[in-house]
Amino acid sequence: LGTDIISPPVCGNELLEVGEECDCGTPENCQNECCDAATCKLKSGSECGHGDCCEQCKFTKSGTECRASMSECDPAEHCTGQSSECPADVGHK
């Protein structure tokens, strides 16, 4: 029997929780132009609100480098154009 406390998501607590597209804090404190702080949803026309592959509320174009190569065994990662997150870091042996 687990003792974990599960609480419903709270919009405005700056934690991205289930059902939220963004959470930038209270409407008075929100600094994210892509996020509607009152609803924790992206504003109309926004594709994203944060991430290495998100610029001005839009996904960065496909092929844009988001993580530099660290060595010949660690190629650079590039944005997909379909997500605000940089793909997982992949290394070659």
From Swiss-Prot:
Pfam families: Disintegrin. The keyword Protease applies. Binds 1 zinc ion per subunit. One of its GO terms (biological process) is proteolysis. Disulfide bonds join 11-40, 22-35, 24-30, 34-57, 48-54, 53-79, 66-86. Its EC number is 3.4.24.-. One of its GO terms (molecular function) is metallopeptidase activity. Ca(2+) 2 binds at residues 74-75, 77, 89-90. Ca(2+) 1 binds at residues 10, 13, 15, 17, 20, 23. PROSITE patterns: DISINTEGRIN_1 (PS00427), DISINTEGRIN_2 (PS50214). Its main location: secreted. Gene3D superfamilies: Disintegrin domain. Residues 8-93 form the Disintegrin domain. This disintegrin-like domain, or derivatives can be considered as possible nextgeneration drugs for treatment of melanoma. N-glycosylated. GO terms for cellular component: extracellular region; plasma membrane. Residues 74-93 are annotated as: Disordered. PANTHER family: ADAM A DISINTEGRIN AND METALLOPROTEASE DOMAIN, DISINTEGRIN AND METALLOPROTEINASE DOMAIN-CONTAINING PROTEIN 28. This is Zinc metalloproteinase-disintegrin-like leucurogin.
